[in-house]
């Protein structure tokens, strides 16, 4: 039996900055213009450093003094903006990813995704990219109470 391969998604398979950076800019604009929050300018490389963090950790590290209510609303705005971009077919996988996945699948590997994303985000991508062609499952951190990936892998292994 072949091993089961578990891939990260954002920044590994999915060229996330393509939709993440504009979505963050939208949320930052809302905080500045409608909430009067002094949000520092964020270069792309800083936004890229947040890939792999769950939403809560990202906002807590970036604007720790911001009230939770505003963090949640800004995160929701960014998430909605990303979903809109996926539905508008602006999301993209890195070049060559499909070929690699086709090769692995043809060699009998079972594959899954494990991501620090929200459940709704994973579902949108699953549908947009027809991910069932390659993957058995898309595990998101929201479903597991935002547990660390190491804990989620242990949970997955028990099923």
Enumerate the predicted regions with their spans.
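N-terminal helical cap/lid subdomain that shapes the substrate entry/recognition surface
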Residues: 2-95
